[in-house]
Amino acid sequence: MRLVDNDLDVRRARVDVTQKELADAVNVTRQTINAIERGRYDPSLELAFALADFFGCDIEDIFNPETDLELS
């Protein structure tokens, strides 16, 4: 299974927001944010846009399809 690499945890730390606060802002659970940060879940396009909007950046700034992660 391939997952897209991301720097969501780094961006979240820069703005001093907890996983719960971010989850509430984009209408998902804290567990979803945790799974994305750990590379265990790829967000839907809708969620990716919501995250980018929250951080005021482009989707590509958070999610890097050039560095896919390989899960066994």
Task: Annotate each language-model stretch with its function.
Residues 1-14:
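A short, Lys/Arg-rich alpha-helix, primarily the initiator
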